[in-house]
C-alpha cells in the first residue's frame, strides 16, 4: 500500500509529464498544420462538455455568487483559457520545445513579481534577485546568447510570443490567489472555461476566415484527445489531489520537472538539440527559481 506522500509524488510527476507532453503535442500540431487557436478552442469546448454534468447543479445553486465575482473570473478566463493556451500553441509554430519549456519554467518566479505589483503578496530582496536571474536566463534563450541579436533586436517570433504566454499565466495564478472562492474548484474551472471560450470564439472564427481550417483526420483526433484528457482534465485533478496530500509548497517543486521532461521528449521525438544558450539560460533560471523558492519556504516555515 502506497503512503500519502508516494501517491502524491506519482500524481504530481504524471501532472508535469502530461503538461510537458502538451508542448510536444503542440509542436506536432504545428507540423501537421493544425491551427493553434482552433486546437485550443476545441480543447476547451470538449473539456467544458465533459465537466458540464458535474458542475451544472452547483452553478445553478451558486449563480448569484458567481455573478457577483464574474469580473475577476472573466479575467481568469481570458488570461488562462483565451491567451495562455492559444499563445503556447501559436509559439510552438516558430520556436523549439526546449526553449518553450525552459521559459515557461520561470512562471513561479513571475507569479511572485506579479503578486507584488498587484499588492497581493509582499516581495523580499531575495525574490527580487530571483526575478532578475530568471529574466537573464530568458534573455539568453531568446537571444541565443548572441550579442548581435540583442543589439539588432532580432528575436524568434515564437520566443517573444511565449513571453506573452508566460506573463499571462503568471497574472492568472496571482489573481487566483487573491481571493478564496466559495465554490468548488471544479466549478470554478468550468466557469473560467466558459468565460475564456466567450473571448476565444471570435478569434477562432477570425483564424478560419484567414484560411486556417482544420483537416479532419487521425492527427487532429489524436492531438485533441490528448490535450483534452491529459494536460487538460487529468492534470488538473491530479494537481488538486497532490496539493491536498502534501501541500502547495511541496507540490510546486514538481513544476521544475517540466523542462527536464520536455527537453528529453523534444530531443527524442523531434531531434532537437540542447544548445549552449539553453544551458546558460537554464543555469540562471534554476538559480532564480531556487533563490525565490528557498527563501519563501524558509519564511513560511
What residue spans do the PLM features occupy?
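Transmembrane alpha-helical segments that form core, pore/gating elements
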Residues: 51, 111-113, 117, 149-208, ...
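Loop-to-transmembrane alpha-helix entry segments
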Residues: 64-68, 101-104, 120-140, 155-159, ...
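Conserved small/polar residues in nucleotide/adenosyl-binding loops
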Residues: 298-301
Amino acid at each position: 500500500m502506497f503512503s500519502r506522500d508516494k501517491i502524491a509524488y506519482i500524481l504530481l510527476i504524471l501532472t508535469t509529464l502530461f503538461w510537458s507532453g502538451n508542448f510536444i503535442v503542440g509542436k506536432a500540431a504545428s507540423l501537421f498544420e493544425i491551427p493553434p487557436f482552433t486546437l485550443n478552442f476545441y480543447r476547451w469546448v470538449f473539456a467544458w462538455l465533459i465537466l458540464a454534468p458535474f458542475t451544472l447543479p452547483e452553478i445553478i445553486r451558486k449563480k448569484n455568487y458567481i455573478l457577483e465575482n464574474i469580473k475577476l473570473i472573466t479575467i481568469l478566463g481570458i488570461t488562462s483559457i483565451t491567451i495562455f493556451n492559444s499563445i503556447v500553441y501559436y509559439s510552438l509554430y516558430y520556436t523549439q520545445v526546449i526553449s518553450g519549456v525552459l521559459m515557461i519554467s520561470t512562471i513561479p518566479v513571475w507569479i511572485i513579481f506579479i503578486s507584488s505589483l498587484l499588492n497581493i503578496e509582499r516581495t523580499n530582496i531575495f525574490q527580487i534577485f530571483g526575478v532578475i536571474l530568471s529574466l537573464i536566463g530568458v534573455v539568453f534563450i531568446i537571444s541565443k546568447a548572441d550579442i548581435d541579436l540583442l543589439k539588432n533586436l532580432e528575436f524568434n517570433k515564437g520566443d517573444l510570443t511565449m513571453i506573452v504566454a508566460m506573463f499571462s499565466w503568471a497574472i492568472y495564478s496571482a489573481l487566483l490567489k487573491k481571493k478564496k472562492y466559495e465554490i468548488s474548484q471544479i466549478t470554478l474551472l468550468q466557469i473560467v472555461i466558459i468565460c475564456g471560450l466567450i473571448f476565444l470564439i471570435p478569434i477562432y472564427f477570425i483564424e478560419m476566415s484567414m484560411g486556417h481550417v482544420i483537416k479532419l483526420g487521425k492527427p487532429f483526433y489524436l492531438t485533441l484527445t490528448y490535450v483534452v484528457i491529459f494536460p487538460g482534465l487529468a492534470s488538473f485533478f491530479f494537481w488538486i489531489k497532490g496539493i491536498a496530500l502534501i501541500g502547495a509548497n511541496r507540490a510546486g517543486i514538481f513544476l521544475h520537472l517540466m523542462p527536464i521532461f520536455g527537453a528529453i521528449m523534444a530531443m527524442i521525438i523531434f531531434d532537437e538539440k540542447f544548445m549552449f544558450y539553453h544551458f546558460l539560460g537554464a543555469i540562471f533560471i534554476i538559480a532564480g527559481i531556487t533563490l525565490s523558492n528557498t527563501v519563501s519556504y524558509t519564511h513560511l516555515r
